[in-house]
């Protein structure tokens, strides 16, 4: 994970065209790796014409595939390439000698962001020497995370959201954070949840916490699911 992120942020072309977002950005650059997240979710940055974007997409794909192949990763047949999303699934053998997979997703549909990008330090000591990565602004990442929690209600979304609330990350900019949530709600769903109905959060079962969250937590503290649900809905 470190070597790939380092490549994406030291290769001039890749750095200029991509920004990290999602759970990996949250748990590497905002929090000190309380939960493991290795999927690399990226936004394509330049706001170009359709034709220009197609050309840049081809070049970007060639650079990424060449690098990953040189590093010993093999592209899986489970990879998906759609209208505006490229999902590269790479197989590799990990340090324990087991087969593993890392996912790199590049979204080409969101090329205009609310805030400028941020160069953020990876805060965990697990990477050794600190590196900087270009990310979507933290407020935007959590606005998208909030909408994901409301819509798909995944255990990891609840965990990340409640960590944000516990740390009061945007307590001095709550109005702007709400605007960002509305912005991402309008662009990320086929049907906008105008009432911001949070009832889907109630569907998160403790079995999902045990299967999807506990295995990737650095420290498995007692998890008060009902308390976390209430906190998120408030």
Language-model-detected regions and their locations in the chain:
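Structured mid-to-C-terminal alpha-helical surface segments
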Residues: 1-18, 28-40, 44-234
